[in-house]
C-alpha cells in the first residue's frame, strides 16, 4: 500500500506506521474494516564494528555497545511486536534492517557481510517463536502460550 512520509492517507492495503521508539498501543496501527495493520519499519538499533563499515560518518537511530545488548534488544523488540500481533491485530512488521548500508549501521550483519552483529541463535529462536504464534492465531479455536526459553 501507499504510505506518505507523515501520516496515513487512508488508501492502500495497509494501515502503516514507521516506529523507531517503543512498540505499544499508542504508536502501533490497528487494522480497520478494509486494511491490515503493519509496522512498516522498526528497530534502527546500531552497532559499530570497526573495519567493516562504509568509510564515512555512520549513524543509527540508537547505537548499542556490544553484540549481546544488540541481540537482547532485538529479542525485546520482537516480543513487543508479537504482543501487538496478538492483542492489536498487526499483520506485518519490518525490521530495519537486514544489513548495514552506506551511512547506516542498523543491520544484522556488517556492510561487507563479514561479521554477524547479533547472536543468530537468539534471532532465529524469537523469529521462529513469532511464526509459531502467527500459525496458532490462524488456527480456529486455539489458545496461545507465550512462555519460551531462549538460547544463551
Labelled PLM ranges:
Residues 11-19, 35-37:
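Active-site regions of enzymes building and remodeling cell-envelope glycoconjugates
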Amino acid at each position: 500500500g501507499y504510505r506518505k512520509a507523515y501520516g496515513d492517507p487512508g488508501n492502500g492495503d495497509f494501515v502503516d506506521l514507521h516506529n523507531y521508539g517503543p512498540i505499544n498501543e499508542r504508536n502501533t496501527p490497528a487494522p480497520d474494516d478494509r486494511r491490515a495493520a503493519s509496522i512498516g519499519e522498526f528497530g534502527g538499533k546500531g552497532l559499530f564494528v570497526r573495519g567493516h563499515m562504509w568509510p564515512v560518518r555512520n549513524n543509527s537511530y540508537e547505537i548499542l555497545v556490544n553484540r549481546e545488548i544488540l541481540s537482547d534488544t532485538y529479542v525485546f523488540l520482537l516480543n513487543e511486536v508479537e504482543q501487538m500481533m496478538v492483542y492489536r491485530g498487526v499483520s506485518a512488521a519490518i525490521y530495519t534492517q537486514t544489513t548495514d548500508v552506506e551511512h547506516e549501521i542498523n543491520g544484522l550483519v556488517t556492510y561487507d557481510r563479514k561479521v554477524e552483529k547479533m547472536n543468530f541463535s537468539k534471532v532465529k529462536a524469537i523469529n521462529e517463536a513469532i511464526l509459531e504464534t502467527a500459525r496458532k492465531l490462524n488456527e480456529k479455536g486455539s489458545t496461545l502460550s507465550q512462555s519460551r526459553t531462549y538460547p544463551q
